[in-house]
């Protein structure tokens, strides 16, 4: 045993003398030193098969040398590039009780977690380690997360001191596996004083927003900017995150404007990048506010401020592709197609055509210019450049463009391919993708139904509608298409019931509002004209660029004998139709 003691003594001496260089330990190469350390561990392990009992005193020389060997062996294997040996050495040190003090044990647990996370290899858990686990971890990532959970628990219990690296590694691991709520739980358990309240709330808001709980995240961000934090400096990241989350929901656009304005006031003359981001979110929120505005003057004001803010953001940070995209989208929404196309093209160049939304915006802008053939060519390019999941939405867009080009048979074939791909994904067990593609599947069946309605093939149309309803019966689109089928069959009362059912699901569904008004104009006497006009005005309040609503309003005015007003409405409908994309920009 004296030989092994001298070896480990040499290792410890060299480690203390030059900690940053472990390539040479004592008079032995690291590989030889590792083998000597392993020999010591084997001897002690055979002597204590169930671990070292607490009866061995802390001053025992064997225990201290053994602990040094436990610590150094995995580091020596890492130096040799033998990651699997290093991981198994860590596991060997941790799987049995060896009387390691709390600090040393925690250090080895953290080192093993780091090795499992960042080594780049999957080191299987050998059977000799599994017998010590009631439920062994499934993979290295799960094992690392469990170790980090243990370390966080020890920190909370006061067994070891706060270590920011543990939280950093746990954040990385849980983010990779998408367990954001679990990450939030661990952040909430951090002891007071480690982070400020603003930092804690911001971190939690990030977790909940990543988990899809935007309302919970916003509630936390409201605390950061609330009266309780008024005496502190504004927390700019929280203001920016609040503006970003609000920009994703038109109903929260005004709150987003408030977040963004406060961020701008706080970053003025400080950080050009943060100021650019704040102005970008401000512009997007202004654009969203315009969509839900009731008055024309307010809508026009918001649209102007949206373009101004986005233009300023683009000038501040010219390399920010997302700002360019937002500017192009806002121009497109306002039907200003030339600058919309320029910005969409610039965005595609900046991202090297790697994003689906860039291709989609470009194709829709070209379709709004009534260049359907060119738009379809862009979609074909997108199908070659994007992944399988994004290809589904482009197949749908391709079919819609083929319908616009009066090629219904080609569109039907494209829809057949789309539905087959969705079915293949479902059978392959890609649950997340199948869930996200349910909407596409319903839309495909309903578009097919409309093709059959136009061809007076009503039984086939009914089959397609039934398919859509079997997926989700509570969709306004399904009942609207049902109404369109009844209307084509001149079953007007049944059509009116179907449109009414659609509006009972979504009172703001514009196609059903317009169709209901059209039916009232067909079915009823002049006494129903005020109701029809009210419906059409409501449709235009919701969607001012709906050319169908303007056209129906023109027909109604003509029926009422207002020729000049009808002409104005027809002119508006014509101009809007000439700049209408085949489907909504957003």
For each of these PLM feature ranges, what is it?
Residues 45, 64, 98, 156, ...:
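Short coil turns that delineate tetratricopeptide repeat
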Residues 42, 95, 153, 192, ...:
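Conserved structural position within tetratricopeptide repeats
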Residues 50, 69, 103, 108, ...:
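TPR alpha-solenoid repeat register
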Residues 5-32, 46-59, 92-99, 115-150, ...:
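Short coil/linker segments at helix-helix boundaries
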Residues 28, 81, 139, 178, ...:
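Residue-level detector of the short coil/turn that links helix A to helix B
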């Amino acid at each position: 045993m004296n030989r092994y003691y001298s070896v480990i003594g040499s290792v410890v001496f060299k480690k203390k003398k030059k900690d940053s260089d472990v390539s040479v330990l004592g008079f032995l190469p690291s590989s030889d030193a590792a083998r000597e350390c392993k020999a010591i561990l084997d001897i002690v392990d055979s002597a204590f098969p169930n671990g070292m009992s607490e009866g061995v005193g802390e001053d025992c020389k064997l225990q201290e040398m053994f602990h040094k060997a436990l610590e150094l062996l995995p580091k020596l294997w890492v130096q040799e590039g033998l990651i699997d040996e290093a991981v198994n050495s860590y596991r060997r040190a941790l799987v049995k009780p060896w009387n390691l003090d709390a600090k040393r044990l925690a250090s080895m647990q953290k080192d093993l977690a780091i090795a499992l996370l960042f080594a780049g290899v999957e080191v299987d858990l050998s059977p000799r380690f599994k017998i010590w686990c009631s439920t062994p971890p499934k993979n290295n990532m799960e094992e690392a997360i469990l170790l980090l959970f243990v370390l966080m628990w020890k920190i909370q219990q006061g067994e070891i001191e706060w270590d920011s690296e543990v939280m950093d590694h746990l954040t990385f691991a849980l983010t990779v596996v998408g367990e954001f709520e679990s990450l939030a739980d661990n952040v909430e358990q951090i002891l007071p004083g480690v982070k400020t309240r603003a930092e804690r709330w911001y971190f939690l808001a990030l977790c909940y927003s990543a988990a899809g709980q935007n309302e919970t995240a916003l509630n936390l961000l409201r605390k950061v900017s609330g009266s309780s934090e008024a005496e502190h400096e504004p927390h700019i990241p929280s203001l920016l995150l609040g503006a970003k989350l609000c920009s994703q929901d038109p109903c929260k656009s005004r709150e987003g404007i408030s977040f963004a304005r406060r961020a701008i006031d706080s970053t003025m003359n400080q950080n050009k990048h943060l100021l650019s981001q704040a102005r970008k979110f401000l512009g997007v929120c202004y654009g969203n506010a315009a969509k839900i505005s009731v008055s024309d003057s307010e809508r026009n004001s918001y649209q102007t401020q949206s373009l101004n803010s986005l233009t300023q953001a683009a000038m501040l940070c010219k390399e920010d592709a997302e700002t360019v995209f937002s500017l192009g989208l806002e121009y497109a929404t306002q039907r200003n197609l030339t600058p919309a196309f320029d910005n969409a093209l610039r965005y595609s160049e900046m991202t090297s055509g790697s994003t689906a939304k860039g291709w989609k915006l470009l194709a829709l802008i070209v379709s709004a210019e009534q260049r359907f053939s060119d738009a379809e060519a862009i979609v074909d390019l997108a199908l070659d450049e994007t992944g399988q999941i994004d290809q589904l939405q482009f197949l749908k867009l391709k079919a819609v463009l083929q319908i616009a080009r009066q090629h219904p048979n080609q569109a039907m074939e494209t829809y057949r391919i789309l539905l087959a791909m969705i079915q293949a994904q479902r059978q392959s067990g890609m649950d997340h993708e199948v869930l996200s593609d349910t909407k596409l599947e319903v839309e495909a069946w309903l578009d097919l139904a409309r093709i059959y309605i136009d061809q007076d093939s009503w039984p086939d149309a009914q089959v397609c509608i039934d398919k859509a309803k079997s997926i989700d019966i509570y969709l306004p689109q399904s009942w609207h298409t049902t109404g369109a089928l009844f209307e084509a069959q001149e079953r007007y009362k049944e059509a009116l019931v179907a449109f009414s059912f659609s509006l009972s699901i979504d009172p703001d569904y514009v196609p059903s509002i317009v169709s209901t008004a059209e039916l009232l104009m067909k079915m009823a006497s002049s006494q129903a004209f005020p109701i029809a006009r009210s419906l059409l005005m409501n449709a235009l309040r919701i969607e001012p660029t709906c050319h169908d609503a303007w056209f129906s309003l023109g027909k109604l005015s003509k029926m009422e004998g207002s020729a000049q007003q009808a002409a104005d409405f027809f002119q508006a409908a014509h101009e809007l139709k000439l700049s209408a994309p085949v489907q909504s920009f957003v």
